């Protein structure tokens, strides 16, 4: 970074727009390949229904598992070298891996590359850390809520675009198109994101114990990590059974896939609408109130999902659930900002990402196990119980310690 750039004030609003675009592109890139992942596994030589299901589950989950392992390392490096560098590393690394995925010749190569994708990821948590350290604290809720809509938008559009591209050009070319999107993200970040960061030597870096002692409220921060994990468990538990549940509700109709896709997408649309607004409200009344209210509202929506009789009823409830979900993670992230310093923001957001990834792995496993033993409807009731526990646990953690007063 040039000296003149160091002297120029950073326009955090511009950085927010560019980071939003980066999260959108990476969200779209990740979800582009999701619709045909089992088909690509089959193309790589896996045959048989049970083997195909097993390998599809493994190659899907391994990315999140390795992301959970690698996130703390990248977070520490971000606190030493800067968050922009980590954004560039992530976008370029994932782009190269996507090219190699399109060239994979067998399932083992593909599995290793999916693990490598998880190891080299981390664009979103580093974007969160970058914006969190630049935005005025009293606007954190709105900024992080707005930023979260970037990844959600990309994840919504990605599957549709991926399906169309796969039908038009075949499976392998989609990986190369995805790589191009990630390379575009790299250049957008390189030329448009600005950061004032003074590199820190390894000796000056805070060790884990010092990170914990530097937190304003270590127990609260840990409880927020657990809250993130449970939010993802609750979200992921429904994913494996949603299409089958819709088919059970719809009966003999020809467009079950379309109806399922619509019902799967509506929470994301609702989150897009609610996240910035509820984030802004959280800046006024406190993110802790938004978090607890959204968790309780989620419980009240999950329970009737177990008793719906039509796909329309399920779709309406999932739309409302998406509106609540849009507030949850931004509220958690805002509370993390309030309870940590800029010096350790990279690690705090990366630890939070690790818990999120663990939830992404365990949620679908929990949902599949419950539905196999007790039926589809039981999944919603158990998930409601998990979220209710989360609400009580979060309320108890927040009640014990007063949230620090936020100033400009």
From Swiss-Prot:
GO terms for molecular function: transmembrane transporter activity. GO terms for biological process: response to antibiotic; response to paraquat; xenobiotic detoxification by transmembrane export across the plasma membrane. Pfam families: MFS_1. The chain crosses the membrane at residues 16-36, 58-78, 92-112, 115-135, 146-166, 173-193, 224-244, 256-276, 290-310, 319-339, 378-398. Disulfide bonds: none annotated. It is a multi-pass membrane protein. Keywords: Antibiotic resistance, Cell inner membrane, Cell membrane, Membrane, Transmembrane, Transmembrane helix, Transport. It is found in: Cell inner membrane. Its main location: membrane. One of its GO terms (cellular component) is plasma membrane. It comes from the Bacteria. Belongs to the major facilitator superfamily. DHA1 family. MdtG (TC 2.A.1.2.20) subfamily. Confers resistance to fosfomycin and deoxycholate. This is Multidrug resistance protein MdtG. It comes from Escherichia coli (strain K12). The gene is mdtG.
